[in-house]
């Protein structure tokens, strides 16, 4: 129905008077959807078990501090000092199960008290929740991506930081944790914390082996796949994955084997996939290797010139209009499918971007190493819980694709904040019944009731 201009235009321009009163008003009414999830997961009790070995018994338990950090990140805040802006919010206090929130100084002192045993137990809890989700999902093929991420800081007093390779902030001290992510669910399975002055492969063998063994022990019927970039390439890593029966693709650095350049330059016939990609494969082994593997040589047509420093006639083939990459794999499928499978690693970069920008994963909150590790783990848990919320309430959108795209269509945490979490509401007790009143927006009503009804059916 068409409306007239008189019905649309408002002439009210007066700025209202502002008053501040203590009322039962919340700015985060949408947190009620996480209340049901936290109850089903028994998150408070399980976090309490992670700190049960600590002898200190503060008024605010360490598990409450960890849960407070998770909610803090779910709401989109970054610095600890930002807690002052919602400490009187009744919905946040109900979700945490407290009558008042801890002071910022209390939170920072609690983070300083955390030890490595507590961090390790939280890592175990994170892995357990991911494995429980994978077991319920019933996925027969599981893809693991491994990569490191740099967390920079401007301060020099952060324990465990070091100056290392940092493309964006040269000379800055940083951490360089190594992550294991699950492609099908878009969750972080585990993280290996490291200082910023180590190579990507530092500690990678033990971490990769531990992740694979834990998943295989919990899900022995699942076919495991691994994707890695050239920083993890080595004869030892390739042999380990092949010996364990893990399907893998690894990028091969040209600098390791001068023969690769000759194989590409001597090749006359390339199998074409489309106007951009062409490739060929062969069974080959370097001189010091004892076993032959399948190497896939890829040529990409591109208009952009190679702008990095080059050493002609040494390692990297230089052809105008093309870029070259090499993969090593033990997969038996066609070259096109191997290429698309490896290119699916791009979803992990998107995941890291979401973790940094929306879960504040890269923020270094305190001076103590264990406190910063706790902050990192709460950021990971906030992300994983957001994915768990959607997987419990939504149906799968697709099966296993060539790129191993997540089988659910996930909304980003920022989208959930804007659509659901950051909504005004009022707590009232009509006839003695606790009620949360929210504005009657049709889109909000539909989404909010969808989540609440899903938890009622599960109960």
What are these regions (language model features)?
Residues 235-239:
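Catalytic cores of alpha/beta
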Residues 149-151, 187, 194-196, 253-255, ...:
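Short, glycine-/Ser/Thr-/acidic-enriched flexible segments
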Residues 141-145, 223-227, 247-249:
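Structural preference for beta-strand elements that scaffold enzyme active sites
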Residues 361-394, 398-434, 438:
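Basic, amphipathic alpha-helical segments enriched in Lys/Arg and hydrophobic/aromatic residues
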Residues 1-172, 176-199, 203-218, 241-244, ...:
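Dynamic "connector" segments at or just before major functional cores
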Residues 37, 83, 88, 335-369, ...:
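Short amphipathic alpha-helical "interface-anchor" segments enriched in bulky aromatics
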Residues 226-234, 254-257:
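Acidic, metal-coordinating catalytic cores used for nucleic-acid/nucleotide bond scission
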Residues 2-16, 20, 247-357, 447-459:
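An anionic, glycine-rich sequence signature occurring as long contiguous blocks
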């Amino acid at each position: 129905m068409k409306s007239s201009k008189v019905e649309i235009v408002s002439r009210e321009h007066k700025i209202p008077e502002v008053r501040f009163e203590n009322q039962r008003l919340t700015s985060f009414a949408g947190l009620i959807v996480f209340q049901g999830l936290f109850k089903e997961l028994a998150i408070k009790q399980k976090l309490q078990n992670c700190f049960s070995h600590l002898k200190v018994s503060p008024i605010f338990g360490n598990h409450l501090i960890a849960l407070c950090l998770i909610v803090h990140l779910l709401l989109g805040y970054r610095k600890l000092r930002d807690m002052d802006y919602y400490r009187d919010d009744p919905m946040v206090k109900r979700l945490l199960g407290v009558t008042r929130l801890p002071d910022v100084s209390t939170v920072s002192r609690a983070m300083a008290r955390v030890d490595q045993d507590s961090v390790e137990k939280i890592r175990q809890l994170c892995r357990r929740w991911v494995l429980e989700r994978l077991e319920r999902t019933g996925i027969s093929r599981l893809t693991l991506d491994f990569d490191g991420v740099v967390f920079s800081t401007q301060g020099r007093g952060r324990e465990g930081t070091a100056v290392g390779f940092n493309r964006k902030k040269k000379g800055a001290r940083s951490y360089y944790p190594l992550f294991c992510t699950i492609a099908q669910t878009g969750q972080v399975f585990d993280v290996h914390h490291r200082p910023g002055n180590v190579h990507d492969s530092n500690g990678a063998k033990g971490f990769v082996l531990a992740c694979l063994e834990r998943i295989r022990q919990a899900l022995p019927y699942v076919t495991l796949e691994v994707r890695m970039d050239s920083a993890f390439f080595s004869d030892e890593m390739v042999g380990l994955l092949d010996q364990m029966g893990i399907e893998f693709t690894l990028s091969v650095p040209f600098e390791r084997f001068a023969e690769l350049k000759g194989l590409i330059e001597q090749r006359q016939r390339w199998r074409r996939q489309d106007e951009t990609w062409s490739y060929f494969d062969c069974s080959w082994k370097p001189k010091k290797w004892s076993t032959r593997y399948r190497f896939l040589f890829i040529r990409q047509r591109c208009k952009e010139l190679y702008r990095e420093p080059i050493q002609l006639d040494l390692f990297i083939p230089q052809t105008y209009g093309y870029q070259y990459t090499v993969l090593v794999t033990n997969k038996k499928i066609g070259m096109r499918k191997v290429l698309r499978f490896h290119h699916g690693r791009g979803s992990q970069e998107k995941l890291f971007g979401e973790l940094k920008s929306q879960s504040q994963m890269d923020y270094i909150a305190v001076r103590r190493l264990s406190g910063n590790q706790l902050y990192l783990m709460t950021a990971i848990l906030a992300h994983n819980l957001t994915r768990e919320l959607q997987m419990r309430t939504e149906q799968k959108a697709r099966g296993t694709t060539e790129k191993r795209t997540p089988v659910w269509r996930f909304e980003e945490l920022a989208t959930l904040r804007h659509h659901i979490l950051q909504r005004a509401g009022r707590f009232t007790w009509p006839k003695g019944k606790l009620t949360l009143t929210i504005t009657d927006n049709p889109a909000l009503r539909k989404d909010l009731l969808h989540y609440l009804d899903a938890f009622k059916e599960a109960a």
